[in-house]
């Protein structure tokens, strides 16, 4: 079984708990996305006989990319790899990026799972973590994702948050 992980290393704001590679400077995003497509092309022979079962967009904040750009990555992967057995395509998302319009557009892609970075349902903890959303906004994002047709929605909780203060 093979999977493809695409790391989108950009964030509007850097969270206090995050150890992943990321940048709050969004200016090079277009160039990085183009470089990722180039690397996919270069490394396509790495999995010649494997069927991709999963595509996972992690970060950083993949939900900073328009849904159409995420779909371009999926289409590109399907050109380069055998995706006939694709079982799951996941996008990590911040609650504040998941507007009804964004979710509608994302639902028209092959993305079928959302991993929403809720981190906490406590506003005080969210402030400690330097998160942009509130607990109510997180609840709303999860509900709106389900209403947009996403039947596979997970939301992450970061319990080391109380140790940050």
Predicted stretch roles:
Residues 1-4:
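Extreme N-terminal starter segment of soluble prokaryotic enzymes
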């Amino acid at each position: 079984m093979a999977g493809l992980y695409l790391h989108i290393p950009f964030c509007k704001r850097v969270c206090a708990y995050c150890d992943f590679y990321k940048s709050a400077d969004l200016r090079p995003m277009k160039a990085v996305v183009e470089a990722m497509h180039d690397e996919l092309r270069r490394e396509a022979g790495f999995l010649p006989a494997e069927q991709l079962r999963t595509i996972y967009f992690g970060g950083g904040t993949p939900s900073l990319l328009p849904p159409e750009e995420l779909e371009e990555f999926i289409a590109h992967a399907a050109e380069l790899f055998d995706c006939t057995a694709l079982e799951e395509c996941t996008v990590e998302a911040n609650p504040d990026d998941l507007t009804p319009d964004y979710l509608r557009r994302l639902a028209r892609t092959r993305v079928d799972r959302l991993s929403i970075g809720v981190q906490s349902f406590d506003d005080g903890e969210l402030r400690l973590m330097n998160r942009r959303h509130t607990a109510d906004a997180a609840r709303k994002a999860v509900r709106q994702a389900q209403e947009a047709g996403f039947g596979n929605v997970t939301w992450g909780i970061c319990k080391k948050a109380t140790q940050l203060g």
